[in-house]
């Protein structure tokens, strides 16, 4: 899912990563933990709940690279007892879906109080609870959504307009529009990017996660908007070239070429 995909990007870029979640005591849960362990991600904060079955997805892939995902939510709906709040003491916290608005609010509030930078990439559950989701932005450092999701929060026709308006609420905003490009802002400048490369698409699964997490890790490492959006775009481009959401996630010290960027001031 979103968070494991992001965790692998962070780890392959040299970050010290801990994964906080819950899995069932079953083959799917064991596989999740093993895959993360193999990527040198700390899984000591993963709770195994023997009463629940792990979340998993079945992906039906078309020759075009498009896919249909059949999802079994399982442990996706977290509860307070699944989270050790003393673990919320990192430099950055990447939050995707928690499956409970009261719990995600509690997590973000506690992390914010601890001085943690929060990157938030809401999933469908959070977006269905729009007002509560919008209220979370007071705790967020970096907010990442696609164009249609951004329109739920602010008015605007272009990704540039949407990002500029969202930047009034958070320090960094990232708005994507699939193959039509993306825009990032720090509240002062808008950096608009197109495609990194036009490559044959094998599997689009995880492309959005690769883009967002690639941007997040470079901002967390103190890189510029230009460097962050370039790396996110390159990471996404790499991922669609192979089957599997983690297979082609870029590793450290990869050499990237420049890509066309348009920079404007807000």
Spans of features found by a protein language model:
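Proline-centered loop/turn at the N-terminus of a beta-strand
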Residues: 57, 117, 142, 171-172
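Anion (oxyanion) recognition and catalysis
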Residues: 11, 37, 112-113, 137, ...
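Structural alpha-helical scaffold elements that stabilize or flank donor/cofactor-binding regions
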Residues: 86, 133-136, 166
């Amino acid at each position: 899912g979103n968070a494991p995909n992001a965790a692998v990007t962070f780890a392959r870029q040299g970050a010290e990563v801990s994964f906080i979640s819950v899995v069932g005591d079953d083959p799917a849960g064991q596989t999740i933990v093993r895959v993360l362990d193999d990527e040198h991600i700390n899984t000591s904060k993963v709770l195994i709940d023997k009463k629940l079955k792990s979340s998993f997805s079945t992906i039906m892939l078309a020759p075009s690279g498009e896919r249909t995902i059949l999802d079994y939510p399982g442990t996706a709906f977290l509860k307070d007892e699944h989270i050790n709040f003393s673990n919320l003491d990192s430099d950055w916290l990447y939050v995707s879906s928690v499956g409970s608005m009261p719990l995600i609010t509690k997590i973000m509030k506690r992390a914010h109080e601890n001085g943690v930078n929060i990157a938030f990439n809401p999933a469908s559950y959070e977006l269905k609870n729009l007002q509560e989701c919008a209220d979370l932005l007071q705790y967020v450092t970096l907010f990442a959504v696609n164009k249609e999701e951004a329109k739920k929060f602010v008015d605007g026709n272009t990704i540039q307009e949407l990002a500029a308006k969202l930047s009034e609420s958070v320090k960094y905003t990232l708005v994507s529009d699939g193959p039509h490009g993306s825009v990032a802002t720090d509240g002062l400048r808008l950096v608009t990017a197109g495609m990194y490369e036009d490559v044959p698409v094998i599997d689009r699964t995880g492309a959005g996660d690769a883009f967002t997490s690639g941007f997040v890790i470079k901002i967390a490492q103190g890189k510029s908007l230009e460097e962050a959006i370039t790396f996110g775009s390159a990471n996404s481009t790499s991922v669609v070239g192979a089957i599997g959401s983690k297979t082609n996630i870029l590793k450290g010290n990869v050499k990237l070429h420049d890509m066309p960027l348009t920079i404007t001031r807000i």
